[in-house]
């Protein structure tokens, strides 16, 4: 696999960047010699996978504990085993910091504001560049992403739904990496821990 695709002239662009399928949809080939993978060997998996799923997969493959309070992704081992994973992710997320790009200078955008986000499910792709109107693409009717529905009144509801989904994904990021939820919520006497009152308001 790779961390990005390549336009190769599609959309009159080269290289990577932006959020068209040519850039963000990247094939991944997994060869797992384990016997448990025989069930899915030679098959294609169409469910959403993100680069952040790789590290949890590697840790799971060598039976090392996965620090779920630190890692955003999901292990792919259940998919390789052919397990029924009904609660698998229903969307993928991507973001870009284009502070070093020429586009930032042309648009006269501050370095901290040169950020963009994308969220995609099976039907829709929603893109938001900070400081600009959102973009929306109907991936069923417009798989090549030529018709931006970002200002379409008819699609205002789906735009709002995708915006909420994007916001939820950003809000749900794992920011507290030093302690698990179990550790934080464990009942204890704050007045006795090392004689220091921590977390008491």
Model-derived regions, located:
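Intrinsically disordered, low-complexity polar regions and short flexible loop motifs
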Residues: 142
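Generic recognition of well-ordered alpha-helical segments
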Residues: 25, 50-61, 75, 79, ...
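Conserved beta-strand positions that form and line the central face of beta-propeller blades
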Residues: 7, 18-19, 28, 44, ...
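Long, internal low-complexity/basic segments
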Residues: 149-201
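Histidine-centered active-site microenvironments of extracellular/periplasmic hydrolases
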Residues: 1-40, 50
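Short, solvent-exposed loop/helix junctions and linker helices
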Residues: 23, 45-52, 70, 113, ...
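Active-site rim elements
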Residues: 15, 37-48, 61-67, 115, ...
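C-terminal cap/loop subdomain of S1 sulfatases and analogous C-terminal strand-loop tails that border
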Residues: 6-10, 52-55, 60-135, 139, ...
């Amino acid at each position: 696999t790779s961390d990005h695709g390549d336009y190769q002239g599609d959309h009159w662009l080269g290289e990577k960047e932006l959020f068209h399928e040519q850039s963000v949809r990247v094939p991944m080939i997994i060869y797992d010699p384990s016997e448990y993978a025989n069930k899915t060997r030679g098959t294609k998996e169409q469910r959403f996978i993100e680069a952040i799923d790789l590290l949890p997969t590697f840790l799971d493959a060598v039976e090392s504990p996965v620090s779920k309070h630190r890692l955003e992704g999901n292990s792919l081992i259940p998919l390789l085993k052919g397990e029924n994973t009904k609660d698998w992710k229903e969307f993928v997320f991507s973001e870009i910091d284009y502070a070093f790009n020429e586009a930032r200078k042309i648009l006269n955008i501050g370095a901290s504001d040169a950020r963009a986000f994308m969220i995609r499910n099976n039907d829709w792709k929603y893109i938001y560049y900070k400081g600009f109107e959102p973009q929306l693409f109907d991936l069923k009717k417009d798989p090549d992403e030529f018709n931006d529905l970002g200002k379409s009144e008819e699609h205002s509801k789906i735009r709002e739904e995708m915006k909420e989904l994007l916001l939820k994904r950003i809000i749900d990021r794992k920011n507290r990496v030093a302690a698990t939820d179990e550790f934080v919520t464990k009942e204890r006497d704050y007045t006795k821990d090392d004689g220091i009152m921590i977390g008491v308001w």
